[in-house]
Amino acid sequence: MKRAIVIVVDSLGIGYMEDVIKIRPQDMGANTFKHLLDKVEEIEIPNFEKLGINKILKHPRLSNRDNIGSYGILNLEHYGADSFVGHQEIMGTKPKKPLMEPFSYFREDVIKKLREDGHKVEIPEKDKPYILVDDLVVVADNIETDYGQIYNITAPLDYIPFDKVLDIGEKVRDVVKVNRVIALGGENVSIEEILNSIETREDGLTGVNSPKSGVYNKGYISRHLGYGVNPEKQISTILSKKDYEVGLIGKMQDVIQCENANRTPAVDTEKVMKSVVESMEYMENGIIAATVQETDLAGHGQDVKKYAEKLMIVDKYIGLIMSEMKEEDILFITADHGNDPTIGFSQHTREKTFLLVYG
């Protein structure tokens, strides 16, 4: 191997897992990729077709041309349908089984820990289980994922540096046993806008509606703090310790720990995919791993048209990546879970994923 290129198309599932009938009945019938092809008016993905996607999907809108790569179907190992854990699995580790509890379950322990460490902690609304730390940081449930899996630490970065937000996130991580704590923030947004975007879901989870708050719009930074993740068993750290280069791009650099990695923050799909091509220009030996996040955001927004638009951008760059590959390079394309924009709700769906390999 000279270079391995890993592209994760966030949430591009290919059909519900067999166990959902018992553990997630709301996901019965989910098939993100198929329903995208069923519903969208325009979609052209010739490079996915070349790599064999229709050998898996068998959809009438796609051609049955002979594939130039290898293909397969992957089952999720983790419980639920989560980006963070999905990425850990892709990169080589299996996290410990976390508790699945809402933030209200740990809130008093978190308040005690933060106050002991000198932080100001308030409960702005007594009937809503979120807290405000140091007048600028909201700690609450993540309302974009499964019940009791993730807590968000959200802040306006024009008023507080991200390292302080991360410090608060790490203190919360020390106390709670859920799957993930995410420290995040953006520029050109106020704490008032963040507070005004707090919503309560039908299942009782209360948290910041991140897209509505504006934190994604400018200067977005996040760091995902996992429960029981061992980066020493991930391919990125293993290669780095053997003096291979490691490039992490987009959401991948948010969720994967690797001390010596070159990191490229990006949400915009064009930027993510262009960064992969640019990394290929200077990297001689190593791994480039990138995540396309806007597909997942389109799934949350139940926006079939936007999802297809982002997928076509990915397809365009896959063609360019293949043309730039050298003899010993290898390309992997996969997904981490599903997020069917036609299912009728805005959360992830527990789906199988595809694997396309070229090289």
Language model features with spans:
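Feature captures the catalytic ectodomains and active-site-proximal regions of enzymes
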Residues: 1-359
